[in-house]
């Protein structure tokens, strides 16, 4: 019998071949995992960048429907005035020749009230508001009527605190208040070409302190658009004296004149006076305060002596 031909004996598979196949298999499995990890890193980076951008945007108090800043915080304006057509709001009220607005507009100046005066009158606001304060984000102090925010309500600080008021405020405080009111009144009269003696202080004229605390009542919702002549029928000329600085003391909280397609905004600066006619030609709102505390005083004037109020007196 012829011998059977056999091939070379089968050698058992060595560890090296098995390891090569295992390595190839592992490498194939690893590729999708690495791609997934790379993708996740890209997504995480994108989210981080978006978050940083949002935080920077928010901290600056940017409002995306504001088209133009007419008064930057860093500017020191001798005077800037923008004339706009008067609305018909004044027609529904008794007119006073030589005072009722025929020239309408808005102005800003940084040279009427000094920063030192603004700091001094802010301390008056701080002393008064230390007696109370709203549970929400907006607190009011009215030295004329005595109205003070306390919790979710208002009290008359003169009746509520009685003789203690003499230890909180001084006659110098009230004299400074009167001096500043007079300076603002003269500024408005000059800008609109009317006699200052025809303007009467009217209510409400008040300090405001706004922070980012969530609103608790309708009185805390200061950010809604409104017209002063509609909200307060006595107003003919409105002014605001800012007592703190945008982006230093607070974020958000800018003043926005609302116009179709091109809003105009004023950035608060301590000592800055913003003033305007009170009709619908100056529809406006205040941005929500996002951080910090914003102080200001609203000083309103009327042409109707029947709606006039006296300067506050410390008695």
From Swiss-Prot:
Q: Does the keyword Signal apply?
A: no
Location of region: Disordered: 1-32
What Pfam families does UniProt report for this protein, alphabetically?
2OG-FeII_Oxy_3
How does this protein sit in the membrane? Single-pass type II membrane protein
Output one GO MF annotation. Answer: dioxygenase activity
Sites carrying sugar chains? 211, 263
Domain Fe2OG dioxygenase, residue spans: 203-305
Q: Where exactly are the transmembrane stretches of this chain?
A: 42-62
Parts of the chain on the Lumenal side: 63-315
Q: What is its main location?
A: membrane
Disulfide bond residue pairs: none
Per the record, what ranges lie on the membrane's Cytoplasmic side?
A: 1-41
User: Any idea what this protein is called?
Assistant: 2-oxoglutarate and iron-dependent oxygenase domain-containing protein 3
Native organism: Rattus norvegicus (Rat)
Taxonomic lineage of the native organism: Eukaryota, Metazoa, Chordata, Craniata, Vertebrata
Identify the gene encoding this protein: Ogfod3
